[in-house]
């Protein structure tokens, strides 16, 4: 993962950047902050689906800075009364997603397949993730604007999908281009991940709607259409 190779940059962006934002929120009396956290804060926890009250044990510097950011947000809320929603996003995917960062596996696969290049899978492909469509994430963010107090909410489908299953979804839209190579597991990678979305449904009344196969189809076709 990028943060393992660039811990200084990860800290500068995720922590120093957040503090700059929060200080200006305090200064200009901003009433509400919505924060993009990550499933990475949970670490390699086998209690799937993971709920928001579990102990956090991140395995990457990215997860550490996201966890620390949540504490900064909580204290700013307690000191200055800023309404805050911490969204712990599962693996978000969708049209126009970049190929960088910690969670862009779908867009990376799109880029490689569209270019006729082999896809590299780190590990045996049985590691799982919770893939949530960007449109469903947008619905959660919109609903979060009205939230009061301090809330921590997973944004997820609550469904485990292995990387091999993800490749199966890609095979349905780009079977003639799909070539897979397996490599050693990367340091800091999590083996299983799926997040409970009970709180998302209860507090924000949002239920993710997009099915993975349809979402992959939309994302890949958009990628090819735009000639990326």
Spans of features found by a protein language model:
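N-terminal Rossmann-like NAD(P)+-binding domain of SDR-like oxidoreductases, especially those catalyzing
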Residues: 1-92, 206, 222
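Short glycine-/acidic-enriched loop or helix-start segments at secondary-structure transitions
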Residues: 2-3, 44-46, 96, 131, ...
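Residues at the N-terminus of a long alpha-helix
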Residues: 57, 99, 130-133
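Conserved donor sugar-nucleotide recognition element shared by glycan-biosynthetic enzymes
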Residues: 61, 69, 102, 163, ...
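Hydrophobic alpha-helix immediately C-terminal to the catalytic Tyr-X-X-X-Lys motif of short-chain
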Residues: 68, 72, 76, 109, ...
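C-terminal substrate-binding subdomain of Rossmann-fold SDR/epimerase-dehydratase oxidoreductases
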Residues: 113-228
């Amino acid at each position: 993962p990028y943060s393992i190779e660039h811990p200084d940059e990860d800290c500068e962006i995720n922590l120093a950047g957040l503090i700059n934002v929060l200080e200006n929120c305090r200064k200009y009396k901003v009433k509400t902050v919505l924060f993009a956290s990550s499933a990475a804060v949970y670490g390699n926890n086998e209690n799937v689906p993971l709920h928001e009250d579990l102990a956090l044990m991140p395995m990457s510097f990215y997860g550490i800075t996201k966890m620390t950011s949540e504490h900064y947000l909580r204290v700013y809320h307690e000191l200055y009364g800023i309404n805050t929603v911490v969204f712990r996003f599962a693996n978000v995917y969708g049209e126009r997603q970049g190929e960088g960062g910690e969670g862009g596996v779908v867009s990376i696969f799109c880029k490689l397949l569209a270019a006729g290049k082999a896809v590299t899978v780190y590990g045996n492909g049985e590691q799982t993730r919770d893939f949530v469509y960007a449109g469903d994430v947008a619905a959660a963010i919109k609903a979060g604007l009205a939230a009061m107090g301090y809330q921590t909410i997973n944004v997820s489908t609550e469904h485990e999908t292995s990387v091999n299953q993800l490749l199966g979804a890609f095979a349905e839209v780009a079977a003639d281009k799909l070539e897979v190579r397996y490599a050693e597991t990367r340091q800091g990678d999590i083996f299983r991940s799926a997040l409970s979305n009970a709180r998302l449904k209860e507090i924000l009344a949002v239920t993710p709607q997009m099915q993975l196969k349809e979402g992959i189809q939309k994302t890949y076709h958009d990628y090819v259409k735009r000639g990326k």
